[in-house]
Amino acid sequence: MYLVMEIQKNGDQVSNLVYSYANRNEAESKYYSILSVAALSTVEQHAVTLLTDQGNCIMSRFYVHKAEE
């Protein structure tokens, strides 16, 4: 089993979503789907991690978006 964990933080609000998949291909598809949205997001902080069910991190990415001046 593989887990995809998504964390969003905007001001004082935090959202944490966890998805589980039976195979790695489906999990990686979800991981990259979240990344494509996170790259363009206006949420202050956006993270996504792909883990095994034993807790081993396969890949992880974290975006910090700052307000444009």
Predicted regions and their residues:
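Short, mixed-charge low-complexity intrinsically disordered segments
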Residues: 36-69
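A structural detector for beta-sheet-dominated domains
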Residues: 8, 22, 51-52
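Conserved short hydrophobic interaction patches
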Residues: 24, 33-38
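Short aromatic-glycine-(Arg/Gly/Cys) micro-motifs in beta-strand/loop hairpins
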Residues: 1-17, 43-45
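A short, exposed loop/beta-hairpin motif centered on an aromatic-Gly-Thr core
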Residues: 13-29
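Aromatic side chains
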Residues: 2, 19-21, 31, 62-63
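Broad hydrophobic/π-residue packing in well-ordered secondary structure
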Residues: 1-7, 30, 34, 49
